Amino acid sequence: MKSKNKLIVILFLVFLVVCRCSKSVEGFEKNIDDLTFSKTQKWGKFEWSAADKLNRTNQNILRNLPIIPFPKNSSYQTKTELADIVKKRKELNEKHMKQIVAEREWKNTIKQFGVKVDEGKRLDNYIFQKVQPIHLTIKRHFDRVRPSFLDKKIVPVIRIPAHGAYPSGHSTEAWSLAFCLSDKYPERKNKYYAIANNIATNRERAGLHYKSDSDYGKLLARKILDLVGSENHPLLGKY
């Protein structure tokens, strides 16, 4: 009888431990999901104020864009993306590193596409007057924490920009260039797409972005150009 009572006590204690562990895990995941860029870093004044300066045209575009939430910090998808960043970091080579450093500046990003001078001016205007203000506004809305704050194995190779992760600005802007140029030079589409994809992936290799940041940036680039319309196309319209 004593042995039976002892077994019951042991089983009860095990049950309590399991319950506490379960609650601890739930609490931990809840805390992880509460992490944002604003709670871990400071927004830049320019980046934060972009949303307050949207003109009417950009506001109309924004209203018609697909606003898709990013995966929760505790989600399986985010954990998979974090592991993917760690893997990409291990594969980082000297060529990638040089590209990552150079691509911090816009002139080095657009240069890769080999645009003509007049095309460059039109594309500059499109990116800085349309694309950038819109994606910065969406970044502010989502305020996604950077990957290195969810996985300490991720150490960014360059300074983290002063704004949230989602969507990737580099991806949005690079794919905007690729889509615009492909409309004018369809025979070079594969080349432009490869350049844009590498620029976006470099930000993941650098430890700055999740894959979902890059994917959403690509989607936004396509949708923004579609909403601008053929009449106002940066290279083919009166824009």
Q: What function would you assign to each model-found segment?
A:
Residues 216-239:
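C-terminal domain-closing interface element
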Residues 208-216:
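A structural-propensity feature for long, helix-poor, extended segments
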Residues 1-30:
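Intrinsically disordered, compositionally biased terminal peptides
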Residues 25-209, 223, 227-230:
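Hydrophobic alpha-helical bundle signature of multipass membrane enzymes
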